[in-house]
Curated annotation (Swiss-Prot):
The keyword Magnesium does not apply. It is found in: Cytoplasm. Interacts with UvrB in an incision complex. The keyword Translocase does not apply. Pfam families: GIY-YIG, HHH_5, UVR, UvrC_RNaseH, UvrC_RNaseH_dom. GO terms for biological process: nucleotide-excision repair; SOS response. CDD domains: GIY-YIG_UvrC_Cho (cd10434). It comes from Methylobacillus flagellatus (strain ATCC 51484 / DSM 6875 / VKM B-1610 / KT). It comes from the Bacteria. Keywords: Cytoplasm, DNA damage, DNA excision, DNA repair, Excision nuclease, SOS response. This is UvrABC system protein C. PANTHER family: UVRABC SYSTEM PROTEIN C (PTHR30562:SF1), UVRC/OXIDOREDUCTASE (PTHR30562). InterPro entries: GIY-YIG_endonuc, GIY-YIG_endonuc_sf, GIY-YIG_UvrC_Cho, RuvA_2-like, UVR_dom, UVR_dom_sf, UvrABC_protein_C, UvrC.
Length: 599
């Protein structure tokens, strides 16, 4: 039994971070404090109100603390430690920094593009957007109104006539000189102003251009400006956040149902509602509103883009958060915990979004649980069957063989636990050898205690593949894991699957509408999808390698020049000898050799 008195006696009344550690030497909770002595002492009072906290305290074997210079510094350290240890009793949000942006590149004729990842100098970025769909819808809108190019530079540099986008009035075709650099730059400026929420300024300028064109009796040009203004008015009426006195803000609300939490984030950028995104934290059962909201703010914004205003639906101590966020952003960041008027309406909407998302998630979980129960009953599996792993092999006539392993656990597909395995050193096309290879690599580690042990393993294949799986699990010392081989039925139609068991002579079949079969199909199809996407990527890379890297005289630099100039291997294959010879470092003789090797 842990005795906290010696620890509490020596704790200072200073800001810092504390770590709760269990008997297995695992960090089970990380917290920050303005006053370490008061905060840590609060865990050892009688009659703790939270069952979650009581359970955590009962597992404490020792406590470690780190004193910091300020509460803000403690906040930074706490966030880093939570990311490193992923403690069992901290509310954890998925680390998702891959929000998409709209980019306007720094080219002579800037390109309108979808962007995710590190931002490059010279380009302008607008966002972040909650998802890729919102970005693509916005790009389509910008194409319709401002007609900017979206093609890659390699395509742009090699066009000799306008593409289809010009024909449907979604691009002004700068690639073939149908618009001057000055006029194109003006369109880019208008698009940039629009993305900043300055539609009225854009419409005023377009109105002036329309009037000028009309006075010169250039009525077709005037009609173009008129149509752009009308399109912008339609967008403004649909998307603009009226009476919202800040152009960039995030609105964040939490909802709880049946012990689960959802955080809904509504993004407003440039005065536009870009959409929302819902987050479902781990380890949040028994947590309260303030704990969940604070965990989200710390983990979501500590290393990401932050708008100047955060509107949150929880009463929090915001001073330390505002200090850290402002220092990180290089400008003042405000956190509004008691919004009024229009901001309160938006917070209510975010809360409604969170409730709806949580209800849908719980309903989906219940459906998956009923499917799992039906599968257990139909196949005679124990009630403890929770974690299912499924394997599939993908190749093209033995080329670029890839195996996949997908995981179903806790009532859902666990994509973060999916794995692909490149299969080498076997006879091409030998699926049995490929399955032996992947199962051996996977379960040798599990047997050594380096991975999670599944309750059930699906093998995409019939008796032969199942026999290989039985041999492998016996060899690695895991003979008691339940195995099931899934064979496609006659004509390979869904609903006719047969399931083979090591201990049964005859296969088991389920009716087409059986919920257990639907779960099996979902897991099997996901394994197939994951395997085939990996196979295609590996095959494409291998074919590109064999097509260019095996040609003598073509090193890395020349290969890069060729692929850049023609936009990929297909472009090189479609180029003539004279076109290939125009690439820097490629003589006419070498161009002839490249052409012959590729045809």
């Amino acid at each position: 039994m842990f005795d906290p008195k010696p620890v509490l006696k020596n704790l200072p009344n200073l800001p810092g971070v504390y770590r709760m550690i269990n008997a297995q030497d695992e960090v089970i909770y990380v917290g920050k404090a303005r006053d370490l002595k008061k905060r840590v002492s609060s865990y050892f009072q009688k009659n703790l109100p939270s069952a979650r906290t009581r359970l955590m305290v009962s597992n404490i074997a020792r406590i470690e603390t780190t004193v910091t210079r300020s509460e803000a510094e403690a906040l930074l350290l706490e966030n880093n430690l939570i990311k490193g240890f992923m403690p069992r009793y901290n509310v954890l949000f998925r680390d998702d920094k891959s929000y998409p942006y709209i980019a306007l590149t720094g080219d002579t004729f800037p390109r309108l593009a979808f962007h995710r990842g590190a931002q490059r100098k010279g380009s302008s970025y607008f966002g972040p957007f909650p998802n890729a769909v919102a970005v693509r819808e916005s790009i389509q809108l910008l194409q319709k109104v401002f007609r900017l190019r979206t093609c890659e530079n390699t395509v742009f540099a090699n066009r000799s006539r306008p593409c289809l986008l010009h024909q449907i009035e979604r691009c002004t075709a700068p690639c073939v000189g149908f618009i001057s650099e000055e006029d194109y730059r003006r369109d880019v400026m208008h698009a940039s102003l629009f993305l900043q929420g300055k539609e009225q300024q854009v419409m005023d300028e377009l109105g002036e251009k329309m009037n000028e064109a009309a006075e010169k009796m250039e009525y077709e040009l005037a009609a173009v400006y008129r149509d752009r203004i009308q399109s912008l008015r339609q967008v403004q009426a649909k998307q603009f956040v009226s009476d919202f006195n800040v152009s960039d803000a995030d609105v964040i609300a939490c909802a709880e149902l049946e012990g689960q939490w959802c955080v809904n984030l509504v993004m407003i950028r440039g005065g536009h509602h870009l959409g929302d995104k819902s987050f479902f934290p781990k380890n949040a059962d028994g947590a309260d509103l303030e704990t969940t909201m604070e965990a989200f703010l710390e983990q979501h914004y500590m290393a990401g883009a932050i708008p100047p205003l955060l509107i949150v639906g929880a009463s929090l101590e915001t001073a330390a958060l505002e200090e850290v966020f402002s220092e990180q952003a290089g400008r003042r960041i405000r956190i509004n915990t008691h919004p009024i008027g229009d901001k309160r309406v938006w917070l209510k909407m975010a809360h409604t979004n969170a409730q709806l998302a949580l209800s849908q998630r719980i309903a989906q979980q219940a459906n998956q649980q009923s499917r799992l129960n039906a599968l257990r009953e139909a196949l005679g599996l124990p009630e403890s069957t929770e974690r299912i792993e499924c394997f599939d092999i993908s190749h093209t006539m033995g080329e670029a063989t890839v195996a996949s392993c997908v995981v179903f656990d806790k009532g859902a597909m666990q994509s973060s636990e999916y794995r692909r395995y490149n299969i080498t050193g076997i006879t091409p096309g030998d699926d049995y050898a490929a399955m032996r290879d992947v199962l051996t690599r996977r379960y040798r580690k599990v047997a050594a205690g380096e991975g999670k042990r599944p309750d059930l393993v699906f093998i995409d294949g019939g008796k032969g593949q199942l026999g290989v799986a039985v041999e492998v699990l016996n060899e690695v010392g895991l003979p008691d894991i339940q195995l099931v081989g899934i064979a496609k039925g006659e004509e390979r139609k869904p609903g006719l699957e047969q399931m083979f068991f090591p201990e049964r002579e005859e296969p088991v079949s389920l009716k087409k509408d059986h919920p257990g079969l639907h779960l099996l199909q979902q897991i099997r199809d996901e394994a197939h999808r994951f395997a085939i996407t990996g196979h295609r990527a590996k095959r494409g890379k291998a074919r590109m390698h064999s097509s260019l890297e095996d040609i003598s005289g073509i090193g890395a630099k020349r290969r890069k020049s060729l692929l850049t100039r023609f936009g990929g291997l297909d472009g090189v294959k479609n180029a003539s000898v004279d076109e290939i010879a125009q690439v820097d470092g490629i003589s006419h003789a070498l161009a002839q050799k490249i052409y012959e090797e590729l045809h």
